């Protein structure tokens, strides 16, 4: 599957670079709406009370406690732009994949998972071929060393300081589906890579 996603994306972008393309107006409208939603959300001061979210689970407990206690409000001045980059990369990825003929079965959907007496919410990125995939923007170093030829699932698992694996399995469990892995765009070069999760996932699902 990873080769199919990458093959279709690379083939489409290569064709566009040589010949151009007439995009589906519906996809252009969806992209515009996603960008607008990101700008409004990131600039808004109405972020509500802290609640545990799938995107924060798997990270160090001390960091989660700081966020709960309000430390997340002390963002550095460039944080907003960094968050917007992530949102826009997701919107670009979805536009390109749909235009390349990849069947996206679900996208940017709110999900909730019951964990004991508590529930945790989140927003999954995409479902493709019956699996949940996470879209990431990455620095050149992370692109190569974490998700690319020099990295991979096993290397991410060895030092998963951001909780990517736990988050992926929580999203997938909320949909009762397997976790596909990560679709990653190098934010410096625009290159793509698909980093797949293993087919046998039961052990990692339990750990998540």
Give the role of each language-model region:
Residues 1-132, 137-155:
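Metal-dependent nuclease catalytic cores that hydrolyze phosphodiester bonds in DNA/RNA
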């Amino acid at each position: 599957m990873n080769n199919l996603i990458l093959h279709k994306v690379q083939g489409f972008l290569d064709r566009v670079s040589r010949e151009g393309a007439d995009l589906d107006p519906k996809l252009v409208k969806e992209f515009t709406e996603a960008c607008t939603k990101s700008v409004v959300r990131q600039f808004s001061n109405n972020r509500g009370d802290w609640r545990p979210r799938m995107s924060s689970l798997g990270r160090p407990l001390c960091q989660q406690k700081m966020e709960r206690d309000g430390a997340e409000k002390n963002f550095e001045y460039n944080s907003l732009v960094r968050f917007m980059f992530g949102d826009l990369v997701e919107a670009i990825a979805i536009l390109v994949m749909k235009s390349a003929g990849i069947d996206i079965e679900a996208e940017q959907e709110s999900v909730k998972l019951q964990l004991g007496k508590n529930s945790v919410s989140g927003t999954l990125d995409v479902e493709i071929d019956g699996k949940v995939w996470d879209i990431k923007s990455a620095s050149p170093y992370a692109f190569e060393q974490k998700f690319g030829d020099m990295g991979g699932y096993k290397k991410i698992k060895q030092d998963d300081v951001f909780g990517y694996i736990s988050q992926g399995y929580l999203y997938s469990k909320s949909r009762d589906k397997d976790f596909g892995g990560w679709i990653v765009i190098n934010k410096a070069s625009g290159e793509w890579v698909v980093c797949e999760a293993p087919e046998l996932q039961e052990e990692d699902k339990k750990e998540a």
